[in-house]
Amino acid sequence: MKKLNTQSPDFQAGLKALLAFETAQNPETERIVADICADVQKRGDAALIEYTNKFDQTNAKSIDDLILTQADLNAAFERIPNDVQTALQTAARRVESYHQRQKMESWSYTDEDGTLLGQQITPLDRVGIYVPGGKAAYPSSVIMNAMPAHVAGVKEIIMVVPTPKGERNDIVLAAAYVAGVTKVFTVGGAQAVAALAYGTETIPQVDKITGPGNAFVAAAKRRVFGVVGIDMVAGPSEILVIADGTTPADWVAMDLFSQAEHDEIAQAILIGTSQAYLDEVEAAMDRLIETMPRRDIIEASLGNRGAMILAKDLDEACEIANYISPEHLELSVENPQEWAKKIRHAGAIFMGRYTGESLGDYCAGPNHVLPTSRTARFSSPLGTYDFQKRSSLIQVSEQGAQKLGETASVLAHGESLTAHARAAEFRMK
């Protein structure tokens, strides 16, 4: 891991270098994805079946072979162990409860002229959820993407999940059952994104696509954005821990590992105010790494993009955190709620030593789909509001038409838009 000290004259340069991440798009990936999207848009189900058989090594004869029914999802739920059933239900219940509180409601008011103004909230009609498949499957992603849509009132929640060599993951399908997914198609990759965006003979066009995927899925989401909405194009996972030295070093070490184990380019950073404590955490990491099944990935991640930063105090640590704008921020300090008030930019803020980031990944309640790569400066976690739309309401009274008409007429003539002005003037006495 890199070692930085805020008192060093080259600290800012070192911090910028630490956060620099090459996000340039791969031209070959973009070309392949463009071809796949165009083909699916043109040939529909036939192209989808062809690509699925090719990339997932399946033997689908028709689109019916790629459809799972509610009975299939229920059967998958019944096959998994009781403790896993309970865990999925507990996580879904907590995520639902949290996202209910995010739900936007319609409102209106009437001004002094009797004109009604307001905002009408409506859910999206249909959304698509992309879920990675195979052995590296993430049932938590199903719950985090589908449940907010369900809470928002979306009528159709369509999930696409690849099944390499026909391998279905019962826990993923059980999560779909618990989270209220209405349809499942066993397709993946850019071809699945294209099918959701453009529609095929069997898969209906959706209004928005959410969910994680590989580079091809990310490229496809970028390509179809504008035809449909997307959640975000997420970068590598990130965690930043601010520690005052009161949390056991082993806990902090494992929290850093929890994000580093995702990917060789994931980022784990620790900011402390004591060199002795940073040394203690480093020693804990050296000891605990021996127990990690994904040791190679963790070591590569920490070597590539990990860091320990020595700050002069917690105020400075919080300012650094605001600059970094991390996906996950742990405030492993005393009085964490007070320090949280100093944080302006973070996807999720985990307050206190008992609030491990992994609890948020699975079952705390808030969404784990979070902005990465410093985009928390201007964007937010996935939520119920992402599956709702706002329409402005305007009902002008007869009296209001006189005053508003006069104003509109003057402004319209100023823009040389005569019909605009006349339309307002016709309603004036």
From Swiss-Prot:
Gene3D superfamilies: 1.20.5.1300, Nitrogenase molybdenum iron protein domain. One of its GO terms (molecular function) is histidinol dehydrogenase activity. GO terms for cellular component: cytoplasm; cytosol. Keywords: Amino-acid biosynthesis, Histidine biosynthesis, Metal-binding, NAD, Oxidoreductase, Zinc. NAD(+) binds at residues 130, 191, 214. PROSITE patterns: HISOL_DEHYDROGENASE. Binds 1 zinc ion per subunit. Its cofactor is Zn(2+). CDD domains: Histidinol_dh. Pfam families: Histidinol_dh (PF00815). Zn(2+) binds at residues 259, 262, 361, 420. Pathway: Amino-acid biosynthesis; L-histidine biosynthesis; L-histidine from 5-phospho-alpha-D-ribose 1-diphosphate: step 9/9. The active site is at 327 (proton acceptor), 328 (proton acceptor). Its EC number is 1.1.1.23. Substrate binds at residues 237, 259, 262, 328, 361, 415, 420. InterPro entries: Ald_DH/histidinol_DH (IPR016161), Histidinol_DH_CS (IPR001692), Histidinol_DH_monofunct (IPR022695), Hstdl_DH (IPR012131). Coiled coil: none annotated. GO terms for biological process: L-histidine biosynthetic process. Catalyzes the sequential NAD-dependent oxidations of L-histidinol to L-histidinaldehyde and then to L-histidine. Belongs to the histidinol dehydrogenase family. This is Histidinol dehydrogenase.
